[in-house]
Swiss-Prot record:
[4Fe-4S] cluster binds at residues 149, 152. InterPro entries: Fe/S_biogenesis_protein_NfuA, FeS_biogenesis, FSCA_dom_sf, HesB-like_dom_sf, NIF_FeS_clus_asmbl_NifU_C. The keyword Plastid does not apply. Involved in iron-sulfur cluster biogenesis. Binds a 4Fe-4S cluster, can transfer this cluster to apoproteins, and thereby intervenes in the maturation of Fe/S proteins. Could also act as a scaffold/chaperone for damaged Fe/S proteins. Homodimer. Binds 1 [4Fe-4S] cluster per subunit. The cluster is presumably bound at the interface of two monomers. PANTHER family: FE_S BIOGENESIS PROTEIN NFUA, IRON-SULFUR CLUSTER SCAFFOLD PROTEIN NFU-RELATED. Keywords: 4Fe-4S, Iron, Iron-sulfur, Metal-binding. It comes from the Bacteria. Belongs to the NfuA family. One of its GO terms (molecular function) is iron ion binding. This is Fe/S biogenesis protein NfuA. GO terms for biological process: iron-sulfur cluster assembly; protein maturation.
Amino acid sequence: MIRISDAAQAHFAKLLANQEEGTQIRVFVINPGTPNAECGVSYCPPDAVEDTDTALKFEQLTAYVDELSAPYLEDAEIDFVTDQLGSQLTLKAPNAKMRKVSDDAPLMERVEYLLQSQINPQLAGHGGRVSLMEITDDGLAILQFGGGCNGCSMVDVTLKEGIEKQLLNEFPELKGVRDLTEHQRGEHSYY
């Protein structure tokens, strides 16, 4: 479910050494399955462990996950990275905003999952997002851009070199990708 690197385990063990005896960590998702989902890690004293929690035992600690957060933390990774600028704890949870779909799910669900878990996080850095509107009978994924992508001059490159390549590589049953967005600068433009 969750992978915690050795460096992150050592970091947590150091922090836990200063806490009440038996205190471990809790990994959770607030607003799971929504675009506003946020992941977090907190201390989990012994009296805060619930019967429905999943206990993930690691070499140096135990991480508790509540029942509601568990499916959204599938494939999550926690790491502690040190570089020239300092140290940073990172928590990557690709399924926090949307539950992972099975390989045999309908094509529409699988494409939507890839857009939400892999492509939109990249576009979000520029204030943008993309939505799947439909998949046509002839295998075209019809997308609509929003936010910072609406009216962006690089949208054609993003669509053809980024999104289309990734979708066609992942889903051979797709024949192409089309953009439904009106990109001429106007009242609807983001900037």
